[in-house]
């Protein structure tokens, strides 16, 4: 269930107010059965596993946004948000083999209070260029309860992400440039540790318009990312009796650097792009596995530098009633202390408008993906969507779609560590070959007085 309310008000041409209220509640129930083999140096037995899961998550959000435009067309904006979230999970795993039956239960819930405020100033385009500046603060408090432990285990996690910045943009002839510099304050507080980190935050870009509809772009950014609360929470969230998953309350933020290069060429209705990007994650948070009392424990650690690079090409065609695009790229991943691993990524999109109808389809295929301790092999496309829509009247809309038309989507997850290997093949039956039908009726009144939505992304 979901509810959404957007209020907008413009008392005059220079002031804009808006407020958003949103509520969400999702309940999920899953059951699964697995057949496999348990193999050691002395034993080779078949086993079966039955799993059941009941989860619910959701929350409430409220935000306020204000924007003032000065006489010189510069803009001052401010934003405030409060978010309350909850998540409850009850999972049971029963493993049966030749010798015994092993039940495992996970029962926990989480509560979140999150606050965010920001202020930004934009001078607009002036003879001297464009100046922007601002500051933002987001504070998140999470409470997690592990009901499997006796007594109930209570964990508290607090995270702070705040920054201030200033940027300048201008152009000289066909060359456009932008530079931004700032400082970021990040704080992490758990029941086991408390740390504060001051880090630089920066970005820069160059855009050069060449003759014959050619554009060359280069972008750089430096930012920092906090660990997720789930990576900090130090209790088991796995129902596999032989494989525990738990967080690490001593993690520190990751520093992220990215460089992008793009070359665009337009030829009539076609656009061709060649691109490359390079990413470096210092103090990378990655998974690792250790062994304690013959149990494998997956956790997280800050482990050196991760490097990711890709090169690719993109072509698109845009006519009045037909659009299509296709991209192909090759990616390299390198985790600290490991060899470089590569994979291929293909994306396609088609849309055809005819009369009051339009037909569109998307396609995404990837052969593999990697983490520090595992890789996933995809046996068919990750995404294969087709949809036909009919705008019957201005108010009445109907659509029929097949979210996944390429048979039954499946993949194999392979975890390989010293002394431990796990292969897990997953078939997404509920997502495959399940068409849906949508009919919507929209009420319009005084549409000429409609106010634009200027809220920032939440």
What spans do the regions from the language model cover?
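Outer-membrane beta-barrel translocator domains and adjoining extracellular loop/strand segments
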Residues: 1, 30-47, 88-97, 143-152, ...
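Face-selective signature of the C-terminal outer-membrane beta-barrel domain
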Residues: 4, 8-26, 53-193, 197-199, ...
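Membrane-embedded beta-strand positions of outer-membrane beta-barrel proteins
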Residues: 19-21, 78-80, 133-135, 179-181, ...
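Feature captures outer-membrane beta-barrel proteins of Gram-negative bacteria and organelles
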Residues: 164-170, 200-208, 276-278, 311-317, ...
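Outer-membrane beta-barrel "beta-signal"
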Residues: 205-207, 426-458
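Outer-membrane beta-barrel signature, preferentially recognizing the C-terminal barrel domain
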Residues: 212, 224-273, 280, 297-309, ...
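Gram-negative outer-membrane beta-barrel transporters
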Residues: 278-285, 295-369
């Amino acid at each position: 269930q979901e509810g959404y309310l957007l209020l907008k008000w413009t008392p005059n041409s220079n002031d804009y107010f808006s407020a958003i209220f949103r509520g969400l509640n999702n309940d999920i129930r899953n059951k699964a059965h697995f057949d496999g083999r348990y193999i050691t140096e002395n034993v080779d037995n078949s086993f079966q596993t039955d799993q059941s899961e009941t989860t619910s998550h959701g929350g409430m959000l409220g935000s306020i946004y204000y924007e003032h435009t000065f006489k010189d067309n510069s803009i001052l904006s401010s934003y405030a948000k409060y978010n309350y979230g909850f998540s409850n999970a009850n999972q049971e795993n029963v493993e049966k083999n030749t010798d015994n039956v092993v039940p495992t239960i996970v029962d926990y819930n989480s509560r979140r209070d999150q606050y965010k405020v920001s202020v930004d100033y934009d001078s607009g385009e002036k003879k001297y260029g464009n100046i922007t500046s601002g500051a933002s603060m987001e504070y998140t408090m999470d409470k997690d309860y592990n009901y499997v432990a006796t007594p109930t285990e209570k964990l508290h996690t607090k995270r702070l992400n705040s920054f201030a910045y200033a940027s300048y943009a201008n152009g000289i002839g066909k060359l456009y440039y932008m530079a931004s510099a700032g400082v970021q304050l990040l704080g992490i507080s758990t029941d086991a540790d408390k740390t504060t980190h001051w880090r630089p935050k920066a970005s820069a870009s160059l855009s050069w318009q060449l003759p014959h509809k050619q554009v060359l772009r280069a972008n750089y950014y430096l930012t920092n990312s906090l660990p997720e609360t789930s990576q900090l929470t130090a209790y088991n969230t796995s129902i596999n009796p032989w494989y525990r998953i738990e967080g690490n309350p001593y993690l520190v933020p990751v520093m992220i650097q990215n460089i992008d290069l793009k070359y665009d060429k337009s030829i009539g209705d076609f656009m061709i792009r060649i691109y490359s990007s390079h990413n470096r994650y210092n103090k990378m948070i990655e998974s690792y596995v250790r062994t304690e009392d013959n149990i494998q424990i997956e956790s997280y650690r800050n482990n050196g530098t991760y490097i990711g690079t890709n090169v690719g090409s993109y072509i698109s065609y845009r006519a009045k009633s037909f659009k299509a695009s296709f991209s192909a790229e090759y990616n390299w991943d390198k985790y600290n202390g490991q060899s470089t691993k590569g994979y291929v990524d293909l994306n396609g999109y088609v849309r055809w408008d005819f009369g009051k109808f339009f037909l569109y389809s998307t396609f995404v295929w990837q052969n593999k993906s990697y983490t520090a301790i595992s890789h996933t092999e995809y046996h068919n496309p990750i995404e294969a969507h087709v949809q036909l829509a009919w705008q019957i009247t201005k108010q009445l809309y109907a659509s029929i779609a097949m979210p996944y038309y390429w048979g039954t989507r499946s993949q194999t997850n392979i975890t390989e560590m010293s002394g431990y290997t796990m292969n897990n093949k997953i078939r997404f039956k509920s997502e495959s070959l399940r068409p849906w039908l949508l009919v919507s009726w929209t009420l319009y009144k005084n549409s000429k007085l409609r106010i634009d939505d200027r809220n920032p992304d939440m």
